[in-house]
Amino acid sequence: MLYELFLTIVFFFSSFGFNEFNEISNCNDDEVFEIFCGFQNPEDLYLSPSKTKIIVSEFGSLAPNTKFGNLVYFDLKTKKREPISINYEANQWGDDTCNLEDKRLSPHGIDLIERNDGKYMLAVVNHLPRETIELFELIETDVIELIWRGCVDAPQNKYFNDIALKKDGSYYVTSMFDSNI
């Protein structure tokens, strides 16, 4: 039984053309893709509530390196990369013991959800200056703006990777590896 299952899985995956990978090494469109350049290490993408913008986390680096990244969006109408302005207010959604240490980020995984209270929450896995999950309220008009609403510190020696939000504000998070390794 297991052998038949194994053969079925091998046959299934071998039917895909994995060797037909066409690398795009410049910023020129081809017959399949329209290419947009100018992003710094785009790590994760999320469609905005209006479905007219794509939120992009531009990864920087992990500690002990200190290359910071950005949160930006790609406007699907104008086809331009745009910065996201962030306003900082009191920690209302995060852990009371988590404090904003630096306004710069090294964002990784992101998730967006409309909370039970009707507000949009954007959660961002952040690697610098320390491992945190940063919580923002997202306001979308013609542009995207964020209001910092709090953070949650990672357990010691853990590197978060991605996050999945629930409507009540709780979440699931993945850990890439233990930093002691």
Regions flagged by a language model, labelled:
Residues 34-70:
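Beta-strand-rich domains and repeat architectures in extracellular enzymes and scaffolds
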Residues 41, 67, 106, 129, ...:
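Beta-rich catalytic cores
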Residues 48-50, 113-118, 165-168:
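Residue-level detector of Asp-centered blade-edge/turn motifs that repeat once per structural unit
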Residues 20-41, 94-95, 145-146:
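A short helix->beta-strand "capping" segment at the edge of beta-propeller domains
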Residues 60-64, 117, 128-130, 178-180:
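Short glycine/acidic-enriched loop and turn motifs that connect beta-strands
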Residues 55-57, 124-125, 173-174:
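Residue position within the beta-strands of beta-propeller blades
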Residues 69-116:
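Blade-loop segments of beta-propeller domains
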Residues 35-38, 85-88, 99-102, 151-156:
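Surface loop/turn motifs at the tips and blade-to-blade linkers of beta-strand repeat domains
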